[in-house]
Amino acid sequence: MRLLISNDDGVFALGIQTLANRLVQAGHEVTVVCPDRERSATGHGLTLHKPIRAERIEGLFDPAVQVWACSGTPSDCVKLALGTLLPELPDFVLSGINHGPNLGTDVLYSGTVSAAMEGVIEGIPSIALSLASFTARDFEPAAEIAVELLERLPHPSSPKVLLSVNIPPVPKEEIAGIRLTRQGVRRYVDLFDQRVDPRGKPYFWLAGEVVEESEPQEPADSHWCDVDAIRRNYVTVTPLQYDLTHYNSLSQLDHLSR
């Protein structure tokens, strides 16, 4: 299959290099268009007030992988690839492998998930892949999961669904299995470290700690939430969509229409 891969960690990240190289080994035609630097937590931002630059990169990936480094955001990269750089549209857009989890409400901030969602917006089935650790360096099990999912998914897949996949940071033999999950809750205690620059003006660094939470599971609910499943060393597969409408409220708030 023809695959487009992007990320938010940048072209030098081990996660995207491992993923692209493994997919080429599996027989896929792979093009990488990703940021030229770290772009984590940029959400679905686009570059509108300055030019976007893209240049071919050689020597970082398997020679069979075509690689572009882009000055824009992850969403810019996918939009530019689909609109200009690729001669043919891909069968799938993949994003990752992210250096860190994208669980629960993380997906609202994630450049990794947003890059994949851009593919869905353009009508192409997409997968976001995240290794659930900021320090782990072995991306091979996660890359193997990507190969397996592409083999098992129907082709063509639904173009309106993004699969957000989180892989536990354990050896392959310790992965408990693959679970279809719903989105959980993952909140943070935000802290702002205030400092003063050499000119005497204050500036701030956003820091903080994650508060691991998950919504209570209903007895009849067979689908775990992603936060719970990853704790138990399951690969989590969470279907997401760009339609954020709260449909139950349409009838409850119908009296507002006039």
From Swiss-Prot:
The gene is surE. It catalyses: a ribonucleoside 5'-phosphate + H2O = a ribonucleoside + phosphate. It comes from Synechococcus elongatus (strain ATCC 33912 / PCC 7942 / FACHB-805). This is 5'-nucleotidase SurE. Belongs to the SurE nucleotidase family. It holds the Pfam family SurE. GO terms for cellular component: cytoplasm. It is found in: Cytoplasm. One of its GO terms (molecular function) is 5'-nucleotidase activity. Its cofactor is a divalent metal cation. Keywords: Cytoplasm, Hydrolase, Metal-binding, Nucleotide-binding. Its EC number is 3.1.3.5. A divalent metal cation binds at D8, D9, S40, N98.
